C-alpha cells in the first residue's frame, strides 16, 4: 500500500475503474511533460500519430477513425497547422474536403511521439514478467470490452 492510498476512499483503492482512470491520468501527465518541450501535448499527438500510421487522410475520415468529434478535430487541426506540423489541401474532387498530411516537422514529431508512448508504456510495465505484461493487456482489454458492452445497453 502506498502512502497516497490513505487519502483515497478504501473502496476506490481497489476499484478497477478508479485504478484504470488514475493510471491514465498519471500516464497522460508524463506524456505531456515529455512532449511539452517540443511544443506539443498529448491532445495534439493523437492526430499526428493517426496521420503517421495511415498517411494523408481526408479530415472527415480522421474524425471517423478517432474518438474526436468534428468541431474538436477542426480546432486541433487548426492548431497543428499553425505549428507547421500538418498541411491541409483541398481535394480536386471536392474543394470543400481537405486532405490532411504531415509536414517534415510533423513527421519528426510523430517519431518523437511514438518513442515517448512506447518508452512510457515500457516504463509502466517495468518489473513485470512477459507473462504479467501480456496478462495486464488482456485484462485491460476485457475490462474495456465489458464497459463498452454495458454502455450499449444504456
Model-predicted regions and their roles:
Residues 2-8, 18-19, 33-35, 44-45, ...:
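Short, flexible segments with low predicted structural confidence
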Residues 11, 18-21, 25-72, 83, ...:
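N-terminal helix-turn-helix DNA-binding core of bacterial DNA-binding proteins
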Residues 13-17, 103-106:
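Short alpha-helical transmembrane interface motifs in multi-pass membrane proteins
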Residues 28, 56, 78-141, 145:
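Charged, amphipathic alpha-helical coiled-coil/dimerization segments
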Residues 8, 64, 90-92:
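Short secondary-structure boundary/capping segments
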Residues 1-12, 131-154:
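C-terminal regulatory/oligomerization modules of transcriptional regulators
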